């Protein structure tokens, strides 16, 4: 986009033209000024056209004369080019401002986070008993109170977990007892349905048929014993010196 008000002047301070130097200043003579304006305007329009063709550029040229007359050139549309220009200026301005605002915000947030990290580190050192040499008695009492509250919370949580474990074990014990009772009931029902199974070792009536062995020795009963000598022939004698071996045979 190019905006130019042609006043009959050049952009450089001095320019060599023709046979001498022409001073760049406002032309006082009205006729000469108008002639110069027409020549320079046509040259400017020609340059704009050449730029758009040679470089495939979007060019829009607007020129107002000293009398307020409008002269324009555009290879596309003057209005469309102006709208594009406004949008580009707006986007650049917004992008710059948003980026600057974001940068400031992140810098502030970063500073806050660094301060929080330092504060937490100092608090942890104090809880561990470090860096307490410069603390006042009031600060030490506050620290002691914090530690007591922390210990109480830890102890409460520990007791809660222990009680939960005990409750679980008690419920587990009840479940196992119920399972055991159910198993006994199934065994008893099995034995009622199959009486022959009750006579086998391991059945419920096995202990009634075969009483448990007695731990106390039974009293001696002479009726259960016979002398072995009474079963031997009369002519059999032992040559022991006045003694006979007598062996008792118990009948069960």
Curated annotation (Swiss-Prot):
One of its GO terms (molecular function) is RNA polymerase II transcription regulatory region sequence-specific DNA binding. InterPro entries: MADS-box/MEF2_TF, MEF2-like_N, TF_Kbox, TF_MADSbox, TF_MADSbox_sf. It comes from the Eukaryota. It comes from Brassica napus. Its main location: nucleus. This is Floral homeotic protein AGAMOUS. GO terms for biological process: positive regulation of transcription by RNA polymerase II. Residues 19-73 form the MADS-box domain. Probable transcription factor involved in regulating genes that determines stamen and carpel development in wild-type flowers. The keyword Transcription regulation applies. Keywords: Activator, DNA-binding, Nucleus, Transcription, Transcription regulation. GO terms for cellular component: nucleus. It is found in: Nucleus. Residues 103-193 form the K-box domain.
């Amino acid at each position: 986009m190019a905006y130019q008000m042609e006043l009959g002047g050049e952009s450089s301070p001095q320019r060599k033209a023709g046979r001498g130097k022409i001073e760049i200043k406002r032309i006082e003579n009205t006729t000469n000024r108008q002639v110069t304006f027409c020549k320079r305007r046509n040259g400017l329009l020609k340059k704009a056209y050449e730029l758009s063709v040679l470089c495939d550029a979007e060019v829009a040229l607007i020129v107002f004369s000293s009398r307020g007359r409008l002269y324009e050139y555009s290879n596309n549309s003057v209005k469309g080019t102006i709208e594009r220009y406004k949008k580009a200026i707006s986007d650049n301005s917004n992008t710059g401002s948003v980026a600057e605002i974001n940068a400031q915000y992140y810098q502030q947030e970063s500073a806050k986070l660094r301060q929080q990290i330092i504060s937490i580190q100092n608090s942890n050192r104090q809880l561990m008993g470090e860096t307490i040499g410069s603390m006042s008695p009031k600060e030490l009492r506050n620290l002691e109170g914090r530690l007591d509250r922390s210990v109480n919370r830890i102890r409460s949580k520990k007791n809660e977990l222990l009680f939960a474990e005990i409750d679980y074990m008690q419920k587990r014990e009840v479940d196992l007892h119920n399972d055991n009772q159910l198993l006994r009931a199934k065994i008893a029902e099995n034995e009622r349905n199959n009486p022959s199974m009750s006579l086998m070792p391991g059945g419920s009536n096995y202990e009634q048929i075969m009483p448990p062995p007695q731990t106390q020795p039974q009293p001696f009963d002479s009726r259960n014993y016979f002398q072995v000598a009474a079963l031997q022939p009369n002519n059999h004698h032992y040559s022991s010196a006045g003694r006979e071996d007598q062996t008792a045979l118990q009948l069960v």
